[in-house]
Amino acid sequence: MADILTQLQTCLDQLATQFYATIGYLSTYHDNSPAIPHPDVPDAAPALAKIPKNSTAPPVPAGAPVPAQSQASPPAQNPAHGAAGAGTSVGEGGQTPGPAAGAGADPNLPAPDSPRTFASRQRELARDLIIKEQQIEYLISVLPGIDSSEAEQEKRIRELEGELRRVEEERELKMRELKRLRRTLENVLRAVETGLYGDRELLERYS
């Protein structure tokens, strides 16, 4: 299991991702016109454009120029449709009418959610942000020494250093004791082997 600082960093990264996802959803699926920056505030954040469908690009200001790859020429007109519309392209007074008022929105942009769905998802996103923020607060509260002053923490560090030295000295004593016991055990085993089989040289001489 990761330590507290690693968990805290992970939660902060997740919170930033949730903020980004929340802003992206609110900017894309609302049914209102984008907010206009106040003219008297030069550093106001610009309005975000809606995110096209199946796009992984981050939100951009609504007034930003369209990228070069998306500035394609208008689609070729259907010959049959063009021929049919040729007779009606000129209105009274020789003026060409503008685009039809009933023309739909950009098909690449997702349709806005219904007010009920939008409000429900707003609450869900807000709840997720609150839960993640509470997790971060809990991890901060359990950090060691969070309620101690700098002097108290330095004193505690010195105490731990002294305790570590004592433990290291005990470990060295145990290691020396272990080596002594191992030599004693080897001598006992050698004596037992000699007592059972006698002197090997004598056995080999008279065998």
Swiss-Prot record:
InterPro entries: Med7/Med21-like, Mediator_Med21. Residues 84-96 have a biased composition (Gly residues). Residues 37-121 are annotated as: Disordered. The keyword Transcription regulation applies. Keywords: Activator, Coiled coil, Nucleus, Transcription, Transcription regulation. One of its GO terms (molecular function) is transcription coregulator activity. It holds the Pfam family Med21. GO terms for biological process: regulation of transcription by RNA polymerase II. It is found in: Nucleus. One of its GO terms (cellular component) is mediator complex. Residues 65-80, 97-108 have a biased composition (Low complexity). Residues 146-196 form a coiled coil. Gene3D superfamilies: Mediator complex, subunit Med21. The keyword ATP-binding does not apply. SUPFAM superfamilies: Mediator hinge subcomplex-like. PANTHER family: MEDIATOR OF RNA POLYMERASE II TRANSCRIPTION SUBUNIT 21, RNA POLYMERASE II HOLOENZYME COMPONENT SRB7. Component of the Mediator complex. Component of the Mediator complex, a coactivator involved in the regulated transcription of nearly all RNA polymerase II-dependent genes. Mediator functions as a bridge to convey information from gene-specific regulatory proteins to the basal RNA polymerase II transcription machinery. Mediator is recruited to promoters by direct interactions with regulatory proteins and serves as a scaffold for the assembly of a functional preinitiation complex with RNA polymerase II and the general transcription factors. Belongs to the Mediator complex subunit 21 family. This is Mediator of RNA polymerase II transcription subunit 21. The lineage of its organism: Eukaryota, Fungi, Dikarya, Ascomycota, Pezizomycotina. The gene is srb7.
